[in-house]
Regions:
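Intrinsically disordered terminal and processing segments
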Residues: 1-13, 22, 107-124, 130, ...
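Mobile-element integrase/transposase regions
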Residues: 1-46, 57, 74, 82
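Short, flexible loop/turn elements at secondary-structure junctions
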Residues: 18-23, 51-55, 63-67, 100-102, ...
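Short conserved micro-motifs at the rims of enzyme active sites and ligand-binding pockets
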Residues: 27-29, 108-109, 275-278
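Residue-level signal for well-ordered, solvent-exposed loop/turn and beta-edge residues enriched
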Residues: 56-57, 283
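Active-site beta-loop-alpha junctions of metal-dependent nucleic acid enzymes
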Residues: 61-87
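Globin-like tetrapyrrole-binding proteins
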Residues: 87, 91-216
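C-terminal, beta-rich DNA-binding module of retroviral/retroelements integrases
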Residues: 177-297
């Protein structure tokens, strides 16, 4: 007898995460070793989706050239940011399900965004609710585009787009920027269609299942870095973030006891009011507030 599963009763109870090679072709021109420009038309991008299986709402996603730990991290970061946009604060999932790609490396990062981490059973696509969702995206959105590549190499050839027709249309394929815009629009429409039901469901989330993600934890695991180390000055830390010199300080007086430390500054590009300062070995962390610099006149 086949086992059946029902969906969670509210959002944020279970997220399912996986990567997918988006079935949209784009053209790319590169220079070969002989200095000649060579254009290829069979390029595709990879998208990692964090899916809330309450109503298949894409709570987070990221697009890149191939699936890798950094792309997964970007998708989880997007999920954290979007949860704040929806709920007013960053929330974690009660349970997060992933595939087994780099599971030893990624487990701790998954644990940041999920109270429980459940790797899916190996070689069983039905174990992951996100797998059928990719087919939904392919048939609902990608199929309508003139650069649609089909259903994958294992599909019946009769269901695939005509290769001669694709070849004739190849010069009209978008470049990488264009296909990224197609993917972003696809995900925007998905969120828009499911937003109302998702928010209504989230209002019923029980307190014991509501897991806030602290600002410090978010910055420590997903924050961007300046690429430089900063030392404490009389006015605090003065890192250059996004090309602008900014002033930060801390109300914790023990911060001043570590004047000899060199600090890495982690920040959220969308909210620079607070940053996290971490020393070289990670043993000390301080949340810093941006200082108001008063004009002289």
């Amino acid at each position: 007898m086949q086992v059946k599963r029902r969906r969670p009763s509210t959002p944020f109870l279970m997220w399912s995460l996986d990567g997918w090679t988006v079935e949209l072709l784009y053209q790319s021109t590169k220079t070969d070793k002989k200095g000649h420009s060579v254009t290829t038309y069979t390029n595709r991008l990879t998208m990692v989706v964090v899916l809330d299986v309450f109503n298949d709402y894409p709570i987070g996603y990221a697009v890149g050239s191939h699936e890798c730990p950094e792309l997964i991290k970007a998708a989880l970061r997007n999920a954290a940011i979007h949860s704040r946009e929806l709920m007013g604060e960053m929330l974690r999932a009660y349970q997060i399900q992933s595939d087994r790609y780099a599971i030893k490396t990624m487990h701790d990062l998954y644990a940041v965004m999920g109270g429980k981490v459940t790797p899916a059973q190996a070689h069983n696509a039905k174990a992951k609710p996100v797998e059928p969702y990719f087919n939904h995206l392919n048939t609902t959105y990608c199929l309508l585009c003139n650069n649609w590549s089909g259903f994958g190499i294992t599909t019946n050839p009769k269901r695939q787009p005509n290769s001669d027709a694709l070849n004739r249309k190849r010069h009209s394929f978008p470049d990488e920027v264009g296909v990224r815009a197609q993917i972003d629009e696809m995900m925007r429409l998905e969120r828009k269609l499911k937003y109302e039901a998702y928010v209504q469901g989230a209002a019923k989330l029980k307190d014991e299942h509501r897991l806030p993600l602290s600002r410090e934890t978010y910055l420590l695991n997903y924050g961007a870095e300046t690429g430089f180390k900063n030392v404490l000055e009389g006015c605090g830390l003065r890192p250059t973030i996004l090309g602008v010199k900014r002033d930060y300080d801390c109300f914790d007086l023990t911060f001043r006891d570590h004047a000899s430390e060199r600090w890495t500054v982690k920040y959220d590009p969308d909210d620079l009011s607070q940053v996290l300062a971490v020393n070289v070995d990670g043993s000390r962390r301080y949340m810093l507030e941006e200082k108001y610099v008063q004009p002289m006149a």
